From Swiss-Prot:
It catalyses: a plastoquinone + NADH + (n+1) H(+)(in) = a plastoquinol + NAD(+) + n H(+)(out); a plastoquinone + NADPH + (n+1) H(+)(in) = a plastoquinol + NADP(+) + n H(+)(out). The lineage of its organism: Bacteria, Bacillati, Cyanobacteriota, Cyanophyceae, Oscillatoriophycideae. Keywords: Membrane, NAD, NADP, Plastoquinone, Quinone, Thylakoid, Translocase, Transport. It is an enzyme of class 7 (translocase). It comes from the Bacteria. This is NAD(P)H-quinone oxidoreductase subunit M. Its EC number is 7.1.1.-.
Amino acid sequence: MLLKSTTRHIRIFAGTVENNELVPDDQALTLDIDPDNELNWNDTAVEQVYRKFDELVESYSGSDLTEYNLRCMGSDLEHFVRSLLQSGEISYNLGSRVNNYSLGLPRVDVDAEAK
């Protein structure tokens, strides 16, 4: 059985991708960041998410691989993505096929618009 955690912007699978197919593997975790491209990402922000993921994996080292643990990790990463959005390191992709502001409404810099 494939263990997984799915949030709006983070998907974690207990498995690997081989020939474009997800193959269950309880010795490897695969992270999919923002699969619907709802956010605008830069390399630095993506690296921050991967580092946070690595930290979470390390913190669960020695624990059983369970759906509950994956969901906890997914939730923590989703909150981390929200913090990146709130700090302005990433932004909503207004050209996305779906505009779902699940992390909060977009902020507009009123001073910049007045100039």
